[in-house]
């Protein structure tokens, strides 16, 4: 862009120079209707002061164009170039920051997925451990209850047997007392004993 502006400016200066030079030639030969090659020099030298005046005006015009147009234009172009470079640098910096933020976001997302997976795995492991502990505890409690129930059954069974034996002994002693008291004959004693045994068996069956 800078090279293009410089080329346009130089082209403009050259065109202005040719235009001024043409005006200068016209002013030097304004009284001559036809210019011949052999009379050009003769026509220029009589107008030497006019030529010098035009040359001085041309130089002044060039300096004016240089200071009033070229330098401000060059300064503006430099400022514009600096502004564009600054904007490009800012855009590059913003792009780099955006890329860095994107990478950070992706890294955080990946870390979040890893942490979430670890949490789920830990929760599943703890759930399995808790389930296993509950099952073991339930089995222990069930086995303990079964053992206690069996102990109670055995205890009740022993009590019943002891009670039955005690009652049998008491009945036997009572029967013996009755035999002694009655003093019946052998047949009667035999019949009484058989009846007593049947009663004991009936009581055992009932229990």
Swiss-Prot record:
The lineage of its organism: Bacteria, Bacillati, Mycoplasmatota, Mycoplasmoidales, Mycoplasmoidaceae. It is a single-pass membrane protein. It comes from the Bacteria. F(1)F(0) ATP synthase produces ATP from ADP in the presence of a proton or sodium gradient. F-type ATPases consist of two structural domains, F(1) containing the extramembraneous catalytic core and F(0) containing the membrane proton channel, linked together by a central stalk and a peripheral stalk. During catalysis, ATP synthesis in the catalytic domain of F(1) is coupled via a rotary mechanism of the central stalk subunits to proton translocation. It is found in: Cell membrane. The gene is atpF. Residues 1-27 form the signal peptide. Pfam families: ATP-synt_B. F-type ATPases have 2 components, F(1) - the catalytic core - and F(0) - the membrane proton channel. F(1) has five subunits: alpha(3), beta(3), gamma(1), delta(1), epsilon(1). F(0) has three main subunits: a(1), b(2) and c(10-14). The alpha and beta chains form an alternating ring which encloses part of the gamma chain. F(1) is attached to F(0) by a central stalk formed by the gamma and epsilon chains, while a peripheral stalk is formed by the delta and b chains. InterPro entries: ATP_synth_b/b'su_bac/chlpt, ATP_synth_F0_bsu_bac, ATP_synthase_B_chain. A lipid is attached at residue 28 (N-palmitoyl cysteine). GO terms for cellular component: plasma membrane; proton-transporting ATP synthase complex. Disulfide bonds: none annotated. This is ATP synthase subunit b. A lipid is attached at residue 28 (S-diacylglycerol cysteine). The chain crosses the membrane at residues 49-69. It comes from Mycoplasma pneumoniae (strain ATCC 29342 / M129 / Subtype 1) (Mycoplasmoides pneumoniae).
